[in-house]
Amino acid sequence: MENMVESGCGENSGKPLILVADDEPSILQYIEHVLQVANYRVITATTVEEAWKIVQQQQGEIELVLTDIVMPGSIDGQDLAKRIQQLDPALPVVFITGALSEADDRAAIMVEKQLLLRKPFFPQQLIDFVGAQLHRESPSGVAR
């Protein structure tokens, strides 16, 4: 089921918009809730295909993508990251996963040049991590 509704609107409309893609409803709801409490706007997707559609439709508005690596469908989180980097190289993509070993983590980071947040994580860890990514400089040298 696609969730194209942006949550956390209203008085927070000036806050960064984050896309979260995960096929586990409980994890998706947890991340969405934590980010909303931290005053971020959130769009969720339960498949990579949905996430890709949202990225295309909201290009220039989304400031960060959090995606699980292992997801059902014809493409996975790594494929999504590659597509996003071709469409918008300045848009940061963070992998969230609990499925990989430490060696696989390092390989994913080195090959894909992506950041990785390991599940499980505490709410404050997620908030701090997201805040740090939103304040990183983009490849053009401008802070996002």
Q: What residue spans do the PLM features occupy?
A:
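The feature encodes the CheY-like receiver
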Residues: 28, 72-74
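Acidic, metal-coordinating helix/loop segments flanking the phosphotransfer/catalytic sites
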Residues: 44-64
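Non-catalytic signal-transmission and effector/linker regions of two-component phosphorelay proteins
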Residues: 1-19, 25, 32, 61, ...
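Acidic catalytic/metal-coordinating carboxylates
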Residues: 46-50, 75-80
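Active-site residues of response regulator receiver
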Residues: 68-69
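Two-component signal transduction core modules
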Residues: 65, 116-117
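Charged docking surfaces used in two-component/phosphorelay signaling
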Residues: 29-37
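Hydrophobic/aromatic residues positioned on beta-strands within the core alpha/beta folds
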Residues: 96-97
